[in-house]
Amino acid sequence: MSEFSPIFIYLVMSLLVSLILLGLPFLFASNSSTYPEKLSAYECGFDPFGDARSRFDIRFYLVSILFIIFDLEVTFFFPWAVSLNKIDLFGFWSMMAFLLILTIGFLYEWKRGALDWE
């Protein structure tokens, strides 16, 4: 056995579990026809007031992307903060450079008006 066999076994098992979980709904689902009422949007027993697939303003998507980017930034800070006493000066300054790049990006987004809701 090579040293990569546990990784291969893990990948095969995860593929099998994924395929089983994808196939189970097709096995247990009923083949009854769907009614138009089941496909329509539910609004507390009333007829729908508008289209259920209304458009969102692009700013919502922009704010969500910015949140994801800066939320991932925090995941880099946790291991750095935990191992701060074990890393040397290079690790400290590399994280400061990372923080500087993110701060410049945040200031650029702010300057361009990506965070303004006018």
From Swiss-Prot:
Core subunit of the mitochondrial membrane respiratory chain NADH dehydrogenase (Complex I) that is believed to belong to the minimal assembly required for catalysis. Complex I functions in the transfer of electrons from NADH to the respiratory chain. The immediate electron acceptor for the enzyme is believed to be ubiquinone. Keywords: Electron transport, Membrane, Mitochondrion, NAD, Respiratory chain, Translocase, Transmembrane, Transmembrane helix, Transport, Ubiquinone. This is NADH-ubiquinone oxidoreductase chain 3. It is found in: Mitochondrion membrane. Pfam families: Oxidored_q4 (PF00507). It is a multi-pass membrane protein. It is an enzyme of class 7 (translocase). The keyword Cell cycle does not apply. The keyword Secreted does not apply. InterPro entries: NAD(P)H_OxRDtase_bac/plastid, NADH_UbQ/plastoQ_OxRdtase_su3, NDAH_ubi_oxred_su3_sf. GO terms for molecular function: NADH dehydrogenase (ubiquinone) activity. Belongs to the complex I subunit 3 family. Its EC number is 7.1.1.2. It catalyses: a ubiquinone + NADH + 5 H(+)(in) = a ubiquinol + NAD(+) + 4 H(+)(out). PANTHER family: NADH-UBIQUINONE OXIDOREDUCTASE CHAIN 3. GO terms for cellular component: mitochondrial membrane; NADH dehydrogenase complex. The chain crosses the membrane at residues 7-27, 62-82, 87-107.
